[in-house]
Amino acid sequence: MIKIAVAGGVTGGHLYPALAVLKELEKLTPIDVLYFTVSGKLEERVLKDYNYKKVSLKIQGLKRPVYSIENIKRLFKIFNANNIVLKELKKFKPDIVFVTGGYVSYPVGTAAKKLKIPLYIQEQNVIPGLANIKLSSFAKKVFVSFEESKKYFQRDVVVAGNPILICHKENLNFEKKTILIVGGSGGSEFLNSLACKLSNKLKDYHFILSSGRKEVPCKSENLTILDYIENMSDYYSAVSCAITRGGATTVSELIFFDTPSIIIPWEGSTEAHQIENAKQIEKLGLGYVIREKEVNIDEIANKIIELSNRERKGSPKTNPAILIAKEIKNEVLK
C-alpha cells in the first residue's frame, strides 16, 4: 500500500490532474489518501464522492501586487495552515506528498520538506505556477505537461503530459452538429454572452454551454445550459467543436481527445499562462487562438463551420496519468 498526501485544487485545472493520477495509481496498488482542500472551493464539492481522508484549510492566495495590505491577513492564515498541515502529516505518516499547484500546494509542500517526506510535483501550465517553481528546489521529481516547461525547473524533470481524468457517465450521441462552450470551472460571463450570440446566428447547430453558475443573458431552443460538467471527457469526445478558455487542463483534454477548438484565453491569467497554453492548439493544427479584443461573431461562426466539418484524425494516446502513476509506484514500492 502507498500512503499519499495530496494538495491541488481551487480550480478544476489543479484538481482533476491530481484525481486522474490517484485513479490510475489505485489500479496498480492499494492507496490511502489524505487530501488537503481549500475551504469552500471546488474540491470540497467534488471530493464528497471520493473515499479519501480530507483536511480543509482556510487560506487564500496572495493578491497581486504582493505588497498589498490585504496580504498581511492572508499570510497569517497561511502561517496557521502550516501548523495544521504539519500536525496532520505527522499523524497520517504518508510515504510521499503529491502536489499539483495552486496556493494550497505551498504549505503542504514545505511541510513535506520539514518532515523529510519525498515530494512529487505535477505542473499543468507551459509557464509554471509560482508555488510549483518554489517547491521544485527540494522536490524528488517534477512532472511537466509540455517540453517548453523544462527550462523553469532545475531538478529531476519528466515530460509526461497533463493527466486526464476520464470519467464515462453518459453515452452522448448528438443528432445535430454540437458546439461545446466552456468558461472553465468558474465560468465566464464573456463566453456566456458569446454563446447567446452564436446560438442565435447558427440556428442549425446545437450549442451546449457550461455556464459556471454565472448568469446567461438569453434563452434559445438550440442552446442547452449546464451549470457545471464533471464528465468533460464524454463531451469532448462527442461534440463537433469546442470554444474554451486556455487553462492548461482544458487545452490538454482538447489535445487528448483531438477536439477541434477555438481558444479565447482569459486575459487575466497569471503571467499570460492561458495565452501560452493556447498556442499548443495552433501548434498542433487543432484549431485557433483568438484574443478577446479580437473576437468577431462572423469570423467565429465561419471557424465553427470549418472546424465542425473536420474529420478527427487523432491516434489513440496513452493517458499521462498512467505514466505518472507507474513512476510513483515504481519509486515508492522498490
UniProtKB/Swiss-Prot annotation:
E.C. designation(s): 2.4.1.227
Compartments reported by the entry: Cell inner membrane
Signal peptide: none
GO CC, alphabetical: plasma membrane
Chain residues that bind UDP-N-acetyl-alpha-D-glucosamine: 11-13, 125, 185, 229, 274
Pathway: Cell wall biogenesis; peptidoglycan biosynthesis
Pfam families with a match to the protein in the record: Glyco_tran_28_C (PF04101), Glyco_transf_28 (PF03033)
Gene Ontology process terms (BP): carbohydrate metabolic process; cell division; cell wall organization; lipid glycosylation; peptidoglycan biosynthetic process; regulation of cell shape
Domain of life: Bacteria
GO molecular function annotations of the record: UDP-N-acetyl-D-glucosamine:N-acetylmuramoyl-L-alanyl-D-glutamyl-meso-2,6-diaminopimelyl-D-alanyl-D-alanine-diphosphoundecaprenol 4-beta-N-acetylglucosaminlytransferase activity; undecaprenyldiphospho-muramoylpentapeptide beta-N-acetylglucosaminyltransferase activity
Keyword terms: Cell cycle, Cell division, Cell inner membrane, Cell membrane, Cell shape, Cell wall biogenesis/degradation, Glycosyltransferase, Membrane, Peptidoglycan synthesis, Transferase
Catalytic activity, as annotated: di-trans,octa-cis-undecaprenyl diphospho-N-acetyl-alpha-D-muramoyl-L-alanyl-D-glutamyl-meso-2,6-diaminopimeloyl-D-alanyl-D-alanine + UDP-N-acetyl-alpha-D-glucosamine = di-trans,octa-cis-undecaprenyl diphospho-[N-acetyl-alpha-D-glucosaminyl-(1->4)]-N-acetyl-alpha-D-muramoyl-L-alanyl-D-glutamyl-meso-2,6-diaminopimeloyl-D-alanyl-D-alanine + UDP + H(+)
InterPro entries per record: GlcNAc_MurG (IPR006009), Glyco_trans_28_C (IPR007235), GlycoTrans_28_N (IPR004276)
Membrane topology label: Peripheral membrane protein
Membership in a protein family: Belongs to the glycosyltransferase 28 family. MurG subfamily.
Role summary: Cell wall formation. Catalyzes the transfer of a GlcNAc subunit on undecaprenyl-pyrophosphoryl-MurNAc-pentapeptide (lipid intermediate I) to form undecaprenyl-pyrophosphoryl-MurNAc-(pentapeptide)GlcNAc (lipid intermediate II).
Name of the protein described by the UniProt record: UDP-N-acetylglucosamine--N-acetylmuramyl-(pentapeptide) pyrophosphoryl-undecaprenol N-acetylglucosamine transferase
Organism: Thermosipho africanus (strain TCF52B)
Gene: murG
